[in-house]
C-alpha cells in the first residue's frame, strides 16, 4: 500500500470518527413550548430537534415529531431519548422523573419584557451552536424596537387587554411582556394596579366598566355572543362606543419569541400610534426622492436661466 493511500485512509478514519463523536454529542432536544420550538427553528437548529409541541406550524419541518405539551406523556418523551427537554411552565412530574437522570430539563418561563426575550434566544443559541445567528437576530429586534418606540406619539389613553372571558375574565399587567409594551407605548393599562403579584390576574367585570377603557385589545377567540361588542353591560364603555376594539392575531399574541417585536409593531399600528415601520421607511424614501427631484429641477432651471442671460 502506497504512503499516499495510507494517509488518505487515515484521514478518512479520523473524519468518520469525528463525525460519529459529534453525532453522539449533539443535543437531542424535545421542546414542549411553542415559543421555544419556533425560536430554535428560526435559528436554523431543526436538526437538533427530536420533537416539538403539536401547536408548532406543520407547514415547515413536517418530519419533526409532534407531541402534546398540555397532557405530557412521559413514557413517550423518554422513548425519544432526549438529552434536553424544554418547558415554559413548571411540571413537577417531569422534574421528578428527570431528577438524577442524564436529561437536562430547561425551564424558560414566559418573558416579562423584551430583554428577557433576548436572553432566552441567546440561551437557546448556545445549546445548538448558533450564537452568531442569534446575535444578529437580537440586534435586528433591538433596532426595530427602537424605530417603533422613537416613532410613537405621546398619549395616555386607557387600555385594557383581555386574555379570557368565558371561564372568568383574565387580563395582564405591567409585569407581563404585553404589559411592558403598553407601558413603553405610553398607555395607561387599567389593570396595572390590580393584584400586582400576578402577571395575569383574574378581574371583575365591574372594574372594566368603572375604568372605562378607550381601547380594548383581545388576544383570544370567543363565540359571536361573547365578543366584546356584543356584551350588553359593556355598551357604554368608550372603546365599545367608538369601535376601538382590536383583535390581535392569537399565535402572535400568545408567544414571546422572535416575533415579539412584530407584535409590538402591530399594537402600535392598530392603536393608531404609528404607521407600520416598513411603510414609514418607504414613505421617507418617497419624500427623499421628491426632494431630490425638486432640488435637481431648481438647479437645472437656474442653470438654464444663467445660460440664457449669458447669451443675451
Please state what every model-predicted region is.
Residues 74-81, 101, 202-212:
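Short helices/loops that flank or line small-molecule/ion binding pockets
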Residues 306-312:
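Short, charged juxtamembrane terminal tails flanking transmembrane helices
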Residues 52-53, 176-199, 218, 244-247:
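His/Asp/Glu-enriched short active-site or ligand-binding loop at hydrolase and phosphoryl-transfer sites
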Residues 2-24:
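Hydrophobic secretory-pathway targeting helix
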Residues 293-306:
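Alpha-helical transmembrane segments
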Residues 28-90, 187-190:
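A short, structured surface patch at a secondary-structure boundary
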Residues 27-28, 93, 113-129, 133-135, ...:
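Structured C-terminal subdomain patch of bacterial secreted/periplasmic proteins
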Residues 25-43, 133-185:
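Basic- and aromatic-lined ligand-binding clefts that recognize polyanionic substrates
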